[in-house]
Structure formats: structure tokens, C-alpha cells
């Protein structure tokens, strides 16, 4: 098997997982370099970069690189690809060729994001890309358009990956294995994939409307034509809040396995409680988004609802934390470095 055949045309979940891990490591170094620039600018009085726009571009790029090209490829693409088939005894992922495409959409997406920083004045909008700052008035030129296309590609990659993981986790188990016998990491990736499948299309819609506002004279987010910039915020945060749970849920799964192993236990405390806590967190994550928007002004009843719903998430999260503590309790703890 030639090098090209193995790495470019792979249909092997382990090879594709390795590609994801390597890509994530490289992107992580880019993201770290960007955060170093941020700290260098803020770590002393006066200016270092000397230009507010450049600083905002660095902050925006740092966020996108770390979220879409480091955490998600490593946690979902890397660990997910490597571990999910192994943990359920499947020969590979449900759709191995689509798995390959999910990975190879990421380098072009990364390239578009880097390009967005180098043309015109860059994307100095913050990772939220709110209009009217992201409009063709405040950000003329191709920068924001390139960033939008970058997000489109990363989004397609993640949606395809999500379909793959959902199908694999549900359908590729041996007949004797019920869903409630799969390891917690498999559950965490399954729930993460469901969140991706439900939230990313909304982001795609929002940024596509922003794209047409910028280039095709639509006014989805422009009051002059009957639009509303607040609509963009709702669309963005309906994705943006589940996204932060997408980033942390695979970590919850990993922590459960790590804690059980280092406590010398064969399983974590309260398996069913852990599963339902993750399911609850995933569900509740979709009905709290407007807490990111309190400063734009909201009805008192709306504020009360979003505040209460947000606080409810603390309950399943607490179940997870105390189950980890209960797993450690009474264990023969391995103090490996």
C-alpha cells in the first residue's frame, strides 16, 4: 500500500483518527501562537501590535482555530474515531468513505480561515461575527466572506461526522449489546453528535443569511430593509450554546473512564445516572441560548425563564461531579504521574 493510498484515500477509522489528532496538534500550535500574541499585547502597558483591528483579528482567529480546528478534531475526530468502534466491537465506522471526506474538508476550511486574516483588514468581529460590524459596510472586502466559507466547510465536515457517529453508535453494536451496555465515552460522543446535527444547520442558515446580506443586497439583519440584527444573535447562540456542550461532553466521557481506571474500579459510580445526566445536559443546552443576549434588552419574563432554565443545568452537572467523587471514594487510587 503506497503512502498516498493509505493517508489520502483512507477508509480506516484508526488512520483517519490519527490524521485528526495530527491536524489538531498542528492547529493547536497555531492557536497557541495566536494566544501568545494576545497575552503579549495585554501583558504590558501601551501597545505592542499597535492596531486595534489586528488585535481583534487575532482574537477572532484564536477562537475559531481552537474550537473548530483543535478541540473538535481531537476530541470527536481523533478520540471518537479511534475509540467508538473499538469500544462497541465494530469493525469500523458505519460510513468509512464519508469519514475520510469529513477529515479532508478541514484543511481547506483551515486555509480559508487563515486567508481571511491576510486579505483586506481581516475579520475583526470576534468569533460571534455579529452584524452590523460584520456587514459589508463595517467590514468591506472579502475577509468575512472567506471566514463564512471556512465555517461552511467545517460545518459540513462536522454534520457528516455527526451522522456517521450516530449511525455507528446505534447500529454497529453486536446484537447482544444494548445501548445501555455501551461505555460512557460512546454515549458522550453519541450525544455530542446529536447536538452537532441539530445545532450546526442553524449556524449555517445564520451565516448564509449574513453572506447574502453582504453580497446580494438582502436585509435579513438590516433594519433599513425590515431586518433585525437581533435575529442573527438568536440564530448564532442557538448554535453557540450547544457548541460549548459539544466541546465539553467528550471530555466528560473521557474523565469518566480515566477516573474509574485510576480509582481501580471496573466501572464508574452510577452508570445510568451519568448517561441521563449527559442526555439532560444535551437537551437543556438547546433551551438556554438567550442568556448570551441579556445585554441587548429582553422582557422580564423572558429573562426570568432563561435564567431559571440555565440554573437547572447545574443539577445534571452536579450529578456527574458527585458520581466522579463517588467513583474515587473507597478506591485503591493509582498515583501514576
From Swiss-Prot:
One of its GO terms (biological process) is mitochondrial electron transport, cytochrome c to oxygen. It is found in: Mitochondrion inner membrane. It comes from Tinamus major (Great tinamou). This is Cytochrome c oxidase subunit 1. O2 binds at residue 245. Fe(II)-heme a binds at residue 62. The lineage of its organism: Eukaryota, Metazoa, Chordata, Craniata, Vertebrata. It comes from the Eukaryota. Belongs to the heme-copper respiratory oxidase family. Its cofactor is heme; Cu cation. SUPFAM superfamilies: Cytochrome c oxidase subunit I-like. Binds 2 heme A groups non-covalently per subunit. Binds a copper B center. Component of the cytochrome c oxidase (complex IV, CIV), a multisubunit enzyme composed of 14 subunits. The complex is composed of a catalytic core of 3 subunits MT-CO1, MT-CO2 and MT-CO3, encoded in the mitochondrial DNA, and 11 supernumerary subunits COX4I, COX5A, COX5B, COX6A, COX6B, COX6C, COX7A, COX7B, COX7C, COX8 and NDUFA4, which are encoded in the nuclear genome. The gene is MT-CO1.
Amino acid at each position: 500500500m503506497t503512502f498516498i493510498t493509505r493517508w489520502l484515500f483512507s477508509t480506516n477509522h484508526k488512520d483517519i483518527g490519527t490524521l485528526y489528532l495530527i491536524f489538531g496538534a498542528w492547529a493547536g500550535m497555531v492557536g497557541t501562537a495566536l494566544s501568545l500574541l494576545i497575552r503579549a499585547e495585554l501583558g504590558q502597558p501601551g501597545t505592542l501590535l499597535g492596531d486595534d483591528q489586528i488585535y481583534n483579528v487575532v482574537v477572532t482567529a484564536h477562537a475559531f482555530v481552537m474550537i473548530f480546528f483543535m478541540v473538535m478534531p481531537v476530541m470527536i475526530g481523533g478520540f471518537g474515531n479511534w475509540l467508538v468502534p473499538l469500544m462497541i466491537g465494530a469493525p469500523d465506522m458505519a460510513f468509512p468513505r464519508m469519514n475520510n471526506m469529513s477529515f479532508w474538508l478541514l484543511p481547506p476550511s483551515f486555509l480559508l480561515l487563515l486567508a481571511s486574516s491576510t486579505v483586506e483588514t481581516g475579520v475583526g468581529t470576534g468569533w460571534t461575527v455579529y452584524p452590523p460590524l460584520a456587514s459589508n459596510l463595517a467590514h468591506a472586502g472579502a475577509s468575512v466572506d472567506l471566514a463564512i466559507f471556512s465555517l461552511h466547510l467545517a460545518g459540513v465536515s462536522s454534520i457528516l461526522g455527526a451522522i456517521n457517529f450516530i449511525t455507528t453508535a446505534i447500529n454497529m453494536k453486536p446484537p447482544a449489546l444494548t445501548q445501555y451496555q455501551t461505555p460512557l465515552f460512546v454515549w458522550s460522543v453519541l450525544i455530542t453528535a446529536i447536538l452537532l446535527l441539530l445545532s450546526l444547520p442553524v449556524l449555517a442558515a445564520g451565516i448564509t443569511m449574513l453572506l447574502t446580506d453582504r453580497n446580494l443586497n438582502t436585509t435579513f439583519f438590516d433594519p433599513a430593509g425590515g431586518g433585525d440584527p437581533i435575529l442573527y444573535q438568536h440564530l448564532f447562540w442557538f448554535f453557540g450554546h450547544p457548541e460549548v456542550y459539544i466541546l465539553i461532553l467528550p471530555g466528560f466521557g473521557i474523565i469518566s473512564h480515566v477516573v474509574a481506571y485510576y480509582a481501580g474500579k471496573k466501572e464508574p459510580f452510577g452508570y445510568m445516572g451519568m448517561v441521563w445526566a449527559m442526555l439532560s445536559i444535551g437537551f437543556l443546552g438547546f433551551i438556554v441560548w438567550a442568556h448570551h443576549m441579556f445585554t441587548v434588552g429582553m422582557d422580564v419574563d423572558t429573562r426570568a425563564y432563561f435564567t431559571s432554565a440555565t440554573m437547572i443545568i447545574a443539577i445534571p452537572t452536579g450529578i456527574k461531579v458527585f458520581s466522579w467523587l463517588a467513583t474515587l471514594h473507597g478506591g485503591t487510587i493509582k498515583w501514576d504521574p
